[in-house]
């Protein structure tokens, strides 16, 4: 995929779906506030699930033009979304927060996505906004890391997309350096969870 085609897809997607994006972003903010207040902490996971499924079906299956979007990216986001919804339903009592200084810092960086895209010379609709693949995965990584319970399969899937932030240097989308940072952090979370499993196994033996 060329950089020009990449930005053309973004432009069409933003122009035609902005109202749905606004609704999803409002739900994410609401879910985050609920979680901070220790109320209905499952709602944020469900909303992240819906947002990832929206990206998989709408951004990649409907607006996508390349095989890699249809056969890799779309299934990946659909799987991430399904796991988030399953987590929200099955572990509805899972506790959120408090976030660490590092998590707050990463969250602050993710909220800067549109501003960074604008400062790099992009304007709406040809710019990166929140309800897009890379910002959504970045939000998903940071917010999911705030929960006590972690699904390592979900973390691995999030890491897979997070590390694609390296493409920021090839598609002139330098704002996706934020995604790369979140991907590296998520990889660290995976290693941490594996370490917990090993320690638990040693204690049991």
Q: What is each stretch, according to the model?
A:
Residues 1-68:
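N-terminal topogenic module of multi-pass integral membrane proteins
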Residues 39-49, 97-106, 146-157:
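Membrane-interfacial loop-to-transmembrane alpha-helix junctions, especially the N-terminal start
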Residues 50-58, 108-118, 158-170:
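Aromatic-anchored segments of alpha-helical transmembrane domains
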Residues 62-66, 144-156, 161-176:
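Membrane-helix boundary connector in multi-pass membrane proteins
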Residues 69-74, 170-183:
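Loop-to-transmembrane alpha-helix initiation sites
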Residues 70-142:
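Membrane-proximal helix-loop-helix units in multi-pass membrane proteins
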Residues 89-94, 190-204:
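Membrane-interface capping segments at transmembrane-helix boundaries
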